Amino acid sequence: MLKLGLDIGSTTIKCVVLDEENKIIYSTYERHYSQITEKIAEILATVRSKVKGVENAAVALSGSAGMGVAESSNIDFVQEVYATRVATNTFIPGTDVVIELGGEDAKILFLTNGLEVRMNGTCAGGTGAFIDQMATLLNVPLEDLDELAKQYEKTYTIASRCGVFAKTDIQPLLNQGARKSDIAESIFNAVVSQTVAGLAQGREIEGQVVYLGGPLTFMSELRNCFDRTLNTKGICPENSHYFVACGAALCAEKTINFDKVIEEVKNYRGSGNFAFNPPLFKDEEDYKKFSDRHAKATVLQKELKGYKGKAYVGMDAGSTTVKGVVLNDDGELLYSKYLPSKGNPVEIIKGFLEEVYAINPEINIVSSAVTGYGEEIIKNAFDVDYGIVETIAHFTAAKYFMPDVEFIIDIGGQDIKCFKIHNGAIDNIFLNEACSSGCGSFLQTFANALGYEIADFAKLGLFAKRPVDLGSRCTVFMNSSVKQAQKDGATIEDISAGLSLSVVKNALYKVIRASSPDELGKRVVVQGGTFLNDAVLRAFEQEMGVEVVRPNIAGLMGAYGAALYSKNKSKGNGKSKLANKETLKNFVHDIKVTNCGMCSNNCRLTINSFGGGRRFIAGNRCERPITKKSQSNELNMYAQKLKMLEEYKPVEGLRGKLGMPMALNMFEMYPFWYRFFTELKFEVFHSPFSTRKIYQRGQQTIPSDTICFPAKLVHGHIQTLIDEGAETIFYPCMSYNFDEHLGDNHYNCPVVAYYPEVINNNMKDVQKICFIKEYFGVHMPKHFPQKAYEALSKYFPDLTLNEVRKAAKLAYDEQDKYRKKVIAKGNEIIEKAEKEGKKIMVLAGRPYHVDPEINHGIDKLISSFNVAIVSEDVVSPRVEKFHTNVLNQWTYHSRLYAAAKYVTTRKDMELIQLVSFGCGVDAITTDEVREILEKEGKIYTQIKIDEITNLGAVKIRIRSLLAAIDND
């Protein structure tokens, strides 16, 4: 008897027919674009016409989207993990591990010693959909991505946990001129990293490994990346992408009536029970009134051809699009262009300028300016007169339409920028931290996944009867909500309108975090390409309860603001140095990638050369590769702290070597433990400061992908110590920190306090050495010697209590000395900055944020703006304990609140809070720090840090803060 198996996945349907010997005699693999039932009916009809005898075949369904159809049509359903296991055991007996990547799901099946399954939960980072998105971003056909990756020379660090994070990494690389082949390989490495760290969760992948699923079938370089990371040679069987369908077929027992089932599948409809919102528009008349009102905010257009007056050029090299405008003296639009950047903004801007000169060869350009992610490369490539930070460009443009504007919201491709305006100056800035679920690319991705162009998809939602209530969630969560709504009978129109509403809710309640729309004021200008979507605009007005102004050039506002800025700066006089026709004719753009090597950062540099001696270097964390001079760290407390820690050199000891991981609280506690164990005659040393290589060394033993990056790094530090021959590693559990009398208690956060237990339970290699993870309480100096003696004498029986007492006294003295040294150095930086009239930035985080691999050189970047940097623990002692709105029981948090309080007393001081993505308790600290600062009229700036290394977005945030302060 023939057997037919269908695997109905999140993006594709696979169908196989097996003969009596379990050989595939027919197979098909097709995308369904969410039209699942129609595609199943079509495939079944095709199979019936092409395969003889299939009418009597046993049929079974599997896959994430197949259960509802199976139930309604009375067809056998086989859970996909079980189907995979059956197929693997049948076709490749002896398999130990199966790694399967699908459209939106990723799985690892451990088949040895019973079945254990690891699946991605809510995030589709590192799956086929993620690779699809990345190929689109690179403007490369998906089928070419694999060949492109094979030509790589260097790789970059790219986050794969989320497609949005990865875009945040890739877009600046493209804007800085990185080679696409290098980025393609980096994308594959990110997928491997996500699968190994996120799914294996500390269990080793060993033995015979089998690769399944579309991405691993069609992309040999992706398989090579897995092989290299796992140090194995995995098997990718022929027809590997059909394995779930084969498993379903192998389990099939019941025959079906094809005609009846095809009819039932075609007629399958959901329940119609889904949460929905009121319609966006009652009728066509309602929509016409809305359109007429918004048509009033219009920039007049004039002809560029034959124009004889003064002209001003503005350009905006954004995250996914490039905009260019030419204005006359009255701010009227002579010419404009809005194009996708296609990963090469330089080429697009060159084309824009060539068109301008072709239309009007005699044009008199007085001044020019550029803004956006690609600002620096464009400024250098084409000799643009001014570079302007995005926030100021958008504010300048908004004032043109509404001089007394109170609030500006700009929703672009990947970012949301909002500014609160008070007394004609930017009073507060909100930017989306890490997620772009409320942005244009979010809608674009959905439209494309459903088989529509974005413009057509947007129009569908205008007159939807029941816009689906999708909440304000991340792209991937939203995928499952959309699929569920479709199963429940929601139309494409309902989904389009629902997504527009969710974009708005995400912007208002997740980015701006407004408790009510009233907080934003009544004089609102909206801009950014996303607001050209009438459904989004209407949803925004409905949610806000106010009528807003949307200029007809909403998508060009960055470029328009840049042009106005250049006009104001030049005062309408002079001649722009912008590249002319001749320069463009001889324009060249060469790219070279190299490592800097001028300091321990060893930054990967992309050197863009444009001929005529013009060049732009990207990827540097300091000015050294450009100026050839060493950056002074004199006014950088982060650099000074690292220098202080480097002073603790190992001293030979009779009791042998003792290693400590330079991670988490060790950045603050090392002086204490160093002195303590040195006095006990150990040769004390620590692992090197973190690098990407150190992270990768411990990657396979990380048990959870949701833990913060600083904690993930601990695994690499322990592995490094073991690899370097450490026979004893000291990494203690510490529930309490020293009491600084700033809070209600003085705990360490749970991760800092108990991570040694995680290491002990997840790293096999620590069992082979002496790993000391006992609980120590440094907060009780009286009891410490006795407790320390009891804990350590188990490992070192020759220790005496007297020795421990002496060592403990000196350790407390050393810690006190180190603490005073930090505060003295910080005070010195503050005094020097005051004398020189420099701004002082409190870069507030945790002790481990001084680690260069964790902060990615943010301290050096801030220093490059001629700003002095101190850490939170320098200024926190200047404040007495005060009331907070949250339980103030963690030492590190108490310092943050005290530092924020102190900053509000100084005009020359600002605070930037560093937050590690995945830090649960920072959900509390960020709100409290924000409240303390904003209450006294200070701007709150937060920078989320993680594996992401590209500082493009960070730079915009810092410049925005500095520009807002200058404007004040």
State each model region's role:
Residues G5-A45, E116-V117, G121, M315-E355, ...:
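Short glycine-rich, Thr/Ser-proximal phosphate-binding strand/loop in the N-terminal lobe
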Residues Q35-I36, N113-K154, C162, S240-V244, ...:
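Glycine-rich phosphate-binding loop plus the immediately following alpha-helix
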Residues G128-Q133, E238-S271, T396, G440-T445, ...:
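Glycine-rich phosphate-binding/hydrolytic loop that grips phosphoryl groups
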Residues K107, K254-K310, K417, N568-N633:
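Acidic, glycine/GT-rich loop-and beta-edge segments that sit at the periphery of enzyme/chaperone cores
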Residues A65, A200-T229, S240-H241, T371-G374, ...:
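Glycine-rich phosphate-binding loops at beta-strand->alpha-helix junctions
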Residues A166-A197, S480-Y509:
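Adenine-nucleotide phosphate-binding core of ATP-dependent small-molecule kinases
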Residues F77-V81, D227-C246, D385-T391, E541-Y560, ...:
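Conserved phosphate-binding/catalytic loops in two-lobed NTP-binding clefts
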Residues L2, N120, A124-I131, I349, ...:
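An N-terminal assembly and electron-transfer interface module characteristic of large anaerobic redox
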